[in-house]
C-alpha cells in the first residue's frame, strides 16, 4: 500500500503525481460509459463518448511516460478523482428533470476536466524542469485535449442545455 508521498525531490513529486493521475484516468475510463448513458442530450452523450476515447489515449501516454523513465506502470489511488466521480454518481442517481440532470452532469464533468488540467499543467512543468522533454510533450498534448474537452462542455452548456434547465424552473418544460 502506498503511504505518503515523498517530498524530498521534484523527481519524486513528479513520479507520485504521475501515479495519481494515472489512477485517476483509469477511474475515469470506468466511469465515463455510465455518465454517457445517463446523459439525455445526444450531443452531451456523444461528447462524453468521444472523451472516453481520448481518456484511453491519456492512459496509454502515461504508460509511455512511465516506461520512458524506467518505472513500473503503477497507479496511486487518486482520491481527488474518486471524490469527483462520487459526486457525479450522486447526480446520476437523483430524481428530477432530464435537462437539469444534463446541466448537473456538465458541471460535474467540468470539475473533472479542471482537476485534470491542473494535474497535467503541473506535471508538464515538472517534466520541463527535470529535463524529461519527451514526457513534457506528451503531457502538453494531453493538457490540450483536456482544455478542448472543457471548451466542448462549455459550448454544450451555453448552447442550450442550461437554458433548457432554466425553463424547467420557469414552468417552460415538463418531462
Q: What would you call each of these model-derived segments?
A:
Residues 1-175:
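Amphipathic alpha-helical hairpins
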Amino acid at each position: 500500500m502506498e503511504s505518503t508521498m515523498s517530498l524530498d525531490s521534484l523527481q519524486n513529486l513528479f513520479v507520485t503525481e504521475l501515479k495519481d493521475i494515472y489512477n485517476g484516468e483509469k477511474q475515469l475510463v470506468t466511469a465515463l460509459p455510465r455518465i454517457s448513458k445517463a446523459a439525455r442530450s445526444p450531443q452531451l452523450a456523444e461528447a462524453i463518448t468521444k472523451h472516453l476515447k481520448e481518456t484511453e489515449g491519456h492512459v496509454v501516454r502515461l504508460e509511455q511516460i512511465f516506461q520512458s523513465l524506467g518505472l513500473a506502470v503503477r497507479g496511486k489511488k487518486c482520491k481527488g478523482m474518486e471524490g469527483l466521480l462520487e459526486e457525479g454518481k450522486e447526480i446520476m442517481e437523483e430524481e428530477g428533470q432530464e435537462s437539469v440532470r444534463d446541466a448537473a452532469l456538465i458541471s460535474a464533468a467540468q470539475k473533472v476536466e479542471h482537476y485534470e488540467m491542473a494535474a497535467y499543467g503541473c506535471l508538464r512543468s515538472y517534466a520541463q524542469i527535470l529535463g524529461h522533454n519527451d514526457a513534457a510533450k506528451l503531457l502538453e498534448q494531453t493538457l490540450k485535449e483536456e482544455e478542448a474537452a472543457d471548451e466542448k462542455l462549455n459550448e454544450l452548456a451555453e448552447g442550450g442545455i442550461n437554458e433548457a434547465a432554466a425553463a424547467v424552473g420557469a414552468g417552460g418544460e415538463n418531462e
